[in-house]
């Protein structure tokens, strides 16, 4: 089994409902268990301004799927929830990013793990570190909290600390 950390984000429609539906779909993946989910945070758009605010969260899973198969499954969930990939950093019903896939490192056209922008995004690190405060970034094993300490966190607010049982 491999421990996987994901970041989920949405800024269209009923944002909280999209997060919930994505979590339910992730919990139903074959050979996969949803172990934990973070609180939900509201943040301004990153990368492309002038959009609606995002809701962001993280979750931890345990899977027997390969990273490539896991990516296909998350992309299928995005598509089933109406995700249309027409603009980089544009609005989306749901975005599911693989942040960490065990200690594995991937650098292919389809998959880059650890996620290449995670250390630059407080809206990713805050919920991720809520799940695992001592998490380290492979392969250098630097604490992720050290990256977070260097980032502006002023535009991130707690939206919901509510936890759902699976």
From Swiss-Prot:
Gene Ontology biological process terms from the UniProt entry: folic acid biosynthetic process; tetrahydrofolate biosynthetic process
Gene3D superfamilies: 7,8-Dihydro-6-hydroxymethylpterin-pyrophosphokinase HPPK
Entries under InterPro entries matching the protein: Hppk, Hppk_sf
NCBIfam families cross-referenced by the UniProt entry: folK (TIGR01498)
Protein family according to the UniProt entry: Belongs to the HPPK family.
Pfam families reported in the protein's UniProt record: HPPK (PF01288)
This protein's pathway: Cofactor biosynthesis; tetrahydrofolate biosynthesis; 2-amino-4-hydroxy-6-hydroxymethyl-7,8-dihydropteridine diphosphate from 7,8-dihydroneopterin triphosphate: step 4/4
Keyword annotations from UniProtKB, A to Z: ATP-binding, Folate biosynthesis, Kinase, Nucleotide-binding, Transferase
Listed EC numbers: 2.7.6.3
Name of protein: 2-amino-4-hydroxy-6-hydroxymethyldihydropteridine pyrophosphokinase
Purpose of the protein: Catalyzes the transfer of pyrophosphate from adenosine triphosphate (ATP) to 6-hydroxymethyl-7,8-dihydropterin, an enzymatic step in folate biosynthesis pathway.
Any one Gene Ontology molecular-function term assigned to this protein's record: ATP binding
Top EC category: transferase
Reactions mediated catalytically: 6-hydroxymethyl-7,8-dihydropterin + ATP = (7,8-dihydropterin-6-yl)methyl diphosphate + AMP + H(+)
């Amino acid at each position: 089994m491999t421990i996987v950390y994901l970041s989920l984000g949405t800024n269209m429609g009923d944002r909280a409902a999209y997060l919930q539906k994505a979590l339910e779909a992730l919990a139903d993946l074959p050979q996969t268990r949803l172990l934990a989910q973070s609180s939900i945070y509201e943040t301004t758009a990153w990368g492309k301004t002038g959009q609606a605010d995002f809701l962001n969260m993280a979750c931890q899973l345990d899977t027997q799927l390969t990273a490539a198969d896991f990516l296909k499954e998350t992309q299928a969930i995005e598509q089933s929830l109406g995700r249309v990939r027409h603009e980089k950093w544009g609005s989306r019903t749901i975005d599911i990013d693989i942040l960490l896939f065990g200690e594995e490192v991937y650098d292919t056209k389809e998959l880059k793990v650890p996620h290449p922008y995670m250390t630059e995004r407080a809206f990713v690190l805050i919920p991720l570190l809520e799940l695992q405060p001592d998490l380290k970034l492979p392969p250098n094993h630097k604490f992720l909290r050290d990256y977070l300490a260097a980032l502006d966190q002023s535009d991130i607010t707690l939206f919901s600390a509510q936890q759902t049982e699976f």
